[in-house]
Design a protein with these regions (language model features):
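Mid-domain alpha/beta scaffold segments of enzyme catalytic cores
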Residues: 1-226
Length: 226
């Protein structure tokens, strides 16, 4: 049996193909999928989906760093509502920092980074109050993510770095803090030997696998829908 710790089912729901996707997952011995929230655009959808597909799925809610804008505080105020539902989220995420595509204008870039950091800190505080694990999105921002988590005194035992893309050095830092890591299909890409080395250095009891569906299909289906 398999457990997909991180996927995004919205695209399949939008094109009315979700029933087929879940059926194929079940046929492939995928016991359960966690569909991960990224913004207001999918939180309510996922809460509704688990009402129908609760045996096969759980969900999370969180504000992805790429969707953090000037109104992020208002959006985060609605997060608590989901923990009042009959089927509450199993984690808060995905949250974190993404410095991969910042504005070229220095002032705008600094503003985006500041928004992301403040939203990240706030969501860690919310997760701490709710006693929930967090799913971390970190792209070109590993050092900054670790620093903010450390400064927040958040329980590292409840931290999952999703789609891990760093090296053995960073894995050892997470191991030392008792955090978790999750690997995707990019592990199979030829250029990612550093990831395979990192996998070998991961504490087995802290290792998770994910599809990040519909993204990041492994070899030989790289570039296609996952």
């Amino acid at each position: 049996m398999w457990f997909d710790s991180h996927c995004h089912l919205k695209i399949f729901s939008d094109r009315e193909d979700l029933e087929n996707v879940i059926s194929r997952a079940t046929d492939s011995q995928v016991l359960k999928m966690i569909t991960v929230g990224t913004s207001l655009k999918d939180w309510r959808l996922y809460a509704n989906l688990v009402e129908k597909y609760g045996d096969q799925s759980d969900y999370t809610v969180g504000l992805h760093p790429s969707y953090v804008g000037s109104f992020w505080e208002n959006e985060l105020r609605t997060l608590y509502d989901y923990w009042l539902m009959d089927r509450a989220p199993v984690a808060l995420g995905e949250i974190g920092l993404d410095f991969f595509r910042l504005p070229k204008d220095k002032r705008l870039a600094e503003e985006v980074v500041d928004f992301q950091k403040e939203a990240f800190r706030t969501q860690l505080e919310i997760a701490s109050v709710l006693k929930m694990p967090v799913i971390i999105h970190s792209r070109n921002a590993f050092r900054e993510c670790v620093k903010i988590i450390d400064e927040s005194d958040f329980d590292w035992n409840k931290v999952v770095f999703h789609c891990f893309s760093e090296s053995t050095k960073e894995i050892m830092e997470i191991n030392h803090r008792n955090g978790w890591v999750s690997f995707t299909g990019i592990l199979t890409y030829k250029a990612n030997e550093h990831l395979r080395e990192a996998l070998r250095a991961t504490d087995l009891d802290r290792l998770m696998l994910e599809t990040d569906s519909p993204y990041l299909a492994p070899i030989p289906k790289r570039g296609k829908e996952n």
